[in-house]
Curated annotation (Swiss-Prot):
The gene is N. One of its GO terms (molecular function) is RNA binding. One of its GO terms (cellular component) is host cell cytoplasm. Pfam families: Paramyxo_ncap. Homomultimer; forms the nucleocapsid. Binds to the viral genomic RNA. N0 interacts with the phosphoprotein (via N-terminus); this interaction allows P to chaperon N0 to avoid N polymerization before encapsidation. Interacts as N-RNA template with the phosphoprotein (via C-terminus); this interaction positions the polymerase on the template. InterPro entries: Paramyx_ncap. It is found in: Virion; Host cytoplasm. Residues 505-515 have a biased composition (Acidic residues). This is Nucleoprotein.
Length: 524
């Protein structure tokens, strides 16, 4: 039997390994786009010219009349301006199955009177039409920088701070956009300005060079559609030699932003490991957590097998990134979130009210995290030679710090779980009402969560115990069964009503039933 059980324990990881293992089958070639990338030639030496070209690249990348692939090419051109050897950079990091980069040089010709004296060329020929297209008159639909609304003079900034600082401010902001562009597009603008604040405070990004919200959204749209651009940026982080002692300020800032990009989209996975497993509490021995623990173990193996690119599997849209979603290990994730909201106040703002939240495990996580004995590590206890008296005093302090009120945190965010708990259309039957009254439950489910609480979104320990008892021991009052029963009753009434009412009445009933079904299904 032991051998059989061990086989099942390793099945999840072996299954994932077999799915992701190369079978040596046919390769499906994609259609590669040809994208123009422009780099500065040796004749472009004036800092004002360089900054003008940088803002020109940025403006073209936001031009909605151009194809996204070429808009991405302009962002690549902008990023390459900070590289000492752009050709080598693109050859090393820009190899991609989706695009082929064609490199053009921008040179300064003193004899030219138009296009600001610039000419686009290669070794063999000059490209007059491309030059006109690149440097010709262009209408900016929106300002690039917030400072442009105040008529800030970029040349004055250039004279004050220098070209490297101005270019660095622009490029760092492009990198900051990547933090949220792929994994949280809805929160892109807010997330961008939150991350930017640290760079504004330390003077890296001057106020006159801060992107407008429209600029941020435009760059984010290009990143979402051009995986080749994202791959180039990720390869830059992977291959950047951070052990050098002569890192430039821009390289250091890119690495700082890279810390936000690493593991983007994997917060649930990382938090489950941190709060659910690494806390090593006794609840991990529960049999209903075992399947999720095995699943998490297989995901750890997959993550480690990706090597240096593992932190970027969501950004790169690796085919396996969907496996890391918390819906694939809901019980363990729910337990971990319960532990998290107790141990880390910042996690109380984390969206836990999701459709797959296991309420029982969420409350269990909070309960064990509040327990003083669960907070003491037996391994460290032996290593540090902690005395019984010291342990007892520690338990006493932990009990006092927890407040003693036994308040439980309510799931935050996520309309589905909120509707399931607070939906007023779900009523109690006569037998349920009597049973509830015997337990001194209130009629309003909101009051059950908030009564006698000292914090927002909390319930009392007695209410939690009653909820746990109701969920585990009394099927007739189980939350899921109550919702399912109400839905069944509504459907039965709808069926009977169809024989007596006209089509308009039927439509009203259907709308009411759909709304109730959505609330019930979303909550459980």
């Amino acid at each position: 039997m032991a051998g059989l059980l061990s086989t099942f324990d390793t099945f999840s990881s072996r299954r994932s390994e077999s799915i992701n293992k190369s079978g040596g089958g046919a390769i499906i070639p994609g259609q590669r786009s040809t994208v123009s990338v422009f780099i500065l030639g040796p004749s472009v030496t004036d800092d004002a010219d360089k900054l003008l070209i940088a803002t020109t690249f940025l403006a073209h990348s936001l031009d909605t009349d151009k194809q996204h692939s070429q808009r991405g090419g302009f962002l690549v051109s902008l990023l390459a301006m900070a590289i000492r050897s752009p050709e080598l950079y693109l050859t090393t990091n820009g190899v991609n199955a989706d695009v082929k980069y064609v490199i053009y040089n921008i040179e300064r010709d003193p004899k030219r009177t138009k296009t600001d004296g610039f000419i686009v060329k290669t070794r063999d020929m000059e490209y007059e039409r491309t030059t006109e297209w690149l440097f010709g008159p262009m209408i900016n639909k929106n300002p690039l920088f917030q400072g442009q609304r105040e008529n800030a003079d970029l040349e004055a900034l250039l004279q004050t701070y220098g070209y490297p600082a101005c270019l660095g401010a622009i490029i760092v902001q492009v990198w900051i956009v990547l933090v949220k562009a792929i994994t949280s597009s809805a929160g892109l603008r807010k997330g961008f300005f939150n991350r930017l604040e640290a760079f504004r405070q330390d003077g890296t990004v001057k106020s006159a060079l801060v992107f407008t919200g429209d600029t941020v959204e435009g760059i984010g749209a290009v990143m979402r559609s051009q995986q080749s651009l994202v791959s180039l940026m990720v390869e830059t982080l992977v291959t950047m030699n951070t052990s050098r002692s002569d890192l430039t300020t821009l390289e250091k800032n890119i690495q700082i932003v890279g810390n936000y990009i690493r593991d983007a989209g994997l917060a649930s996975f990382m938090n489950t490991i941190k709060y659910g497993v690494e806390t090593k509490m006794a609840a991990l021995t529960l049999s209903n957590l075992r399947p999720d623990i095995n699943k998490l173990r297989s995901l750890v193996d997959i993550y480690l097998s990706k090597g240096a690119r593992a932190p970027f599997i969501c950004i790169l849209r690796d085919p396996v990134h969907g496996e890391f979603a918390p819906g694939n290990y809901p019980a363990l994730w729910s337990y971990a979130m319960g532990v998290a909201v107790v141990q880390n106040k910042a996690m109380q703002q984390y969206v836990t009210g999701r459709t797959y939240l296991d309420m029982e495990m969420f409350l269990l996580g909070q309960a064990v995290a509040k327990d003083a004995d669960s907070k003491i590590s037996s391994a460290l206890e032996e290593e540090l030679n902690v005395t019984d008296t010291a342990k007892e005093r520690l338990r006493h302090h932990l009990t006092n710090l927890s407040g003693g009120d036994g308040a439980y945190h309510k799931p935050t965010g996520g309309g589905a779980i909120e509707v399931a708990i607070d939906h007023t259309d779900i009523t109690f039957g006569a037998e349920d009402t009597a049973d509830r009254d015997n337990k001194n439950w209130t009629n309003n489910s909101n009051e059950r969560w908030s009564n006698h609480s000292i914090n927002n979104h909390t319930i009392t320990i007695s209410g939690a115990e009653q909820l746990e008892e109701e969920t585990n021991d009394e099927d007739i009052t189980d939350i899921e069964n109550k919702i399912a029963r109400r839905l069944a009753d509504k459907k039965q009434r709808l069926s009977q009503a169809n024989n007596k009412q006209d089509a308009n009445s039927d439509a009203d009933y259907e709308n009411d039933d759909d709304a109730t079904a959505a609330a019930g299904i979303g909550g459980i």
